[in-house]
Amino acid sequence: KDGVQYFEEKIPLGNAGALFKIRNLLGKEPFLLLNADAMFEVDFNRMLKFHKEHKALVTLFTHPNSHPYDSGLIVANEKSIVEEWLTKEDARPQWYKNRVNAGLHIIDPSVLDMLSINEDDIGREINGKVVKVDLDRQILKPLCGKGFMLCYDSPEYVKDMGTPERYYAVENDYKKGIVSAKNLANKQKAVFLDRDGTINVYKGFLRDIDEFELIDGVADAIKKINNSGYLCIVVTNQPVIARGEVTYEQLDMIHKKMETLLGLDGAYIDGLYYCPHHPHKGYEGEIPELKIDCKCRKPKPGMLYMAEKDFNISLSDSFMVGDGENDIIAGNAAGCRSVLIA
C-alpha cells in the first residue's frame, strides 16, 4: 500500500549495511532479500511455505549449476540445515554435492538483532576504514551449524546477468520462454535417468566408490538435457543398502562423486531418488527392516511419483531412460515415454 521505497547510500556500506539502516522498517515478518543483477522466476509462495514449516530464521535458495568447481558450495545435512559454507577460496572435499547459493534469501529480521554489529558504526570511519557489512561473511556464514539456516533446493530459473555475455544469454532464455517455464507453479517436464549402466559403467552391485566411473559421453548428454528445459532426475534401485553391503553414508559419497564428476564436465542433475529396499531375505549382514516389498523399487513407479509431487512434473510429458526392462516398465506405469538404451 505504501508503494516502492528506496534507501540511498551516501557512501558504500557493503552489500548488507543498508539492512541495519532500515531495520525499523522491516517489522517482524520474514523479508525477501534478492541480488539485483539476477534474472529469476521463482514460486516464492512455495519457498516461504518451506521457510515457515521448517521454522527457519534464514532460508537460502540453492540449486546446482554447471560450474560447481569454482562456485561457493552450501553443505547441508539430510534435514536441509546448512552446516558449512565453502567459498571458492576454501579447501573443499574431493567429492561434494553440487549445491550453490543462488542469491535469493528469506530472512527473519530478528537475525539482525542477534549479530554483534553496531548500526551506528556502519558508514563511519574507524581506524582509517569505513565500516561496511558483508552479507555472506558477516551475516550468513556465521549462522552455519547453528540449526536455523536452511537451504531450499530448487531447479527454478535463477541466473546472474551481471556481465554483457551473461545478460545476452539470459535475454535469449527469456525470449524462448525458458525463464517463466521453470517456475514450479507451472507443470514441469523431466528426463528420468537410471544410474548403473546408464550414467556410470555397470559393475553389478556397486559397493566401492573407486569403481564408480562415468560412461563416456554421458556428461555431454546430460548437458543437453540441462539446456533443453527438461529437468534431469536420477531414479535408481540400490538394494546394496538392504543387503548390508553399503551404508547410507557410503551411498551418499558415491552420489557426491557422481555430481562432482558431472560438474567438472559442466553437467548437473536436478534431483536424485534411490530405493534402499530389497524383497528377498537371507543375506549375511542384511538390514531386516529394509527387506520389504516396497512401492519405490523399479519396476514399480514409486520414485517417479515422488518426483512428480516434489517438482510438479507432468509425467505424460516426461521420459524414462534406462538400460533395463525394469526401467521401461516403471516409466510406462507412470505414464512416461520410455527409452531403452543398449
Residue ranges and their predicted role:
Residues 22, 37, 51, 74, ...:
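Residue-level signal for inorganic ion chemistry
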